[in-house]
A protein has these predicted regions:
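An acidic/histidine-cluster motif and surrounding catalytic segment
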Residues: 1-121, 132-167
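Short active-site segment of divalent metal-dependent hydrolases/proteases
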Residues: 126, 130-131
Length: 167
């Protein structure tokens, strides 16, 4: 059973409920991963998502990555591969980790890509969730695998391929 804990601060439009979008994006990413059972096994699985401003993300990016500027999404995995494979529903709750999105960066990127903030935020949650599941883009092969999984997850959400050039 997947639990997605969402905290959206004042930087994010409070008139929009981000809960459903974030949850669906995380579920889609898990479904397209090597660990789809995490969303359906009955085992308690949790992801925390913080929707915040650029300043907080800049500070976290500086502290944890040594980069003194905001980025669109940060992911902090907490589970190892052996934890992800565990299917016993009696196993302790699995904390996959934290995903943090920066409002200003997300908004600027969405505008540049000519997509809605909601679609871009969903893409970043998918991307962040895949990082929590051990995927990365350090090599071309890994990046290609991650991109395919992102595109398939976004298709589940009815969101166009963000890597495809507009005609």
């Amino acid at each position: 059973m997947l639990e997605v804990a969402i905290d959206a601060d004042g930087e994010w439009d409070s008139s929009r409920s981000w809960d459903g979008l974030v949850r669906r994006a995380a579920e889609a990413a898990i479904a397209e991963s090597a660990f789809p059972q995490l969303a359906t096994s009955g085992r308690a699985v949790e992801i925390s998502v913080l929707l915040t401003g650029d300043a907080e993300v800049r500070d976290l990016n500086a502290e944890y990555r040594g980069k003194h500027q905001p980025t669109n999404v940060l992911s902090f995995p907490m589970a190892g591969p052996e934890d992800l494979r565990e299917t016993n529903i009696a196993a302790p709750e699995l904390l996959l980790g934290d995903i943090i999105l920066a409002r200003g960066v997300c908004e600027a990127e969405a505008r540049d890509k000519d997509v809605s903030l909601e679609d871009h935020a969903a893409h970043l949650v998918v991307h962040g969730t895949l990082h929590l599941l051990g995927y990365d883009h350090h090599s071309e092969e890994d990046a290609a695998d991650m991109e395919v999984r992102e595109v398939r997850a976004l298709q589940r959400l009815g969101i166009a391929n963000p890597y495809e050039e507009a005609a």
